[in-house]
Curated annotation (Swiss-Prot):
GO biological process assignments: protein import into mitochondrial matrix; regulation of cardiolipin metabolic process
Alphabetical keyword list: Chaperone, Membrane, Mitochondrion, Mitochondrion inner membrane, Protein transport, Translocation, Transmembrane, Transmembrane helix, Transport
Keyword Protein transport in annotation: yes
PROSITE patterns: DNAJ_2 (PS50076)
GO molecular function: ATPase activator activity
Transmembrane segments: 5-22
Mitochondrial matrix side: 23-113
Cellular location(s): Mitochondrion inner membrane
Record's subunit section: Interacts with PHB2; the interaction associates DNAJC19 with the prohibitin complex. Interacts with TIMM16/PAM16. May be a component of the PAM complex at least composed of a mitochondrial HSP70 protein, GRPEL1 or GRPEL2, TIMM44, TIMM16/PAM16 and TIMM14/DNAJC19.
Main location: mitochondrion
Encoding gene (name): dnajc19
Name of protein: Mitochondrial import inner membrane translocase subunit TIM14
Domain of life: Eukaryota
Amino acid sequence: MATPIIVGATIAGIAYSSRFLIRVIQRAKSKQLFEMVSTPGFTVETIEDGFENKMTPAEAANILGLKEESTKEEIKIRHKLLMIKNHPDKGGSSYLATKINEARNVLSSKNSN
């Protein structure tokens, strides 16, 4: 009679401990990220001006986070990663998705010539 109670309590304890451990690990990871971002050597470059009427290769490279001389494969990979993060169907901005696509097209056409 006592065996099912002991087994149930043991399973509940293991589940609770696992949940607690997962939360501790997640907090530690977010704390490390916060410390990395708040260090003086970590800077984020921002652009004060908006987008140009016609996107330039320099602006396209800046949007994708690449160099203007990047290969088609690098452009393709970076475009895919940014679209996964910013796709409108996943809650991202359709404006940003449009700019990411335009940047890919500008860099791809520049590098094919």
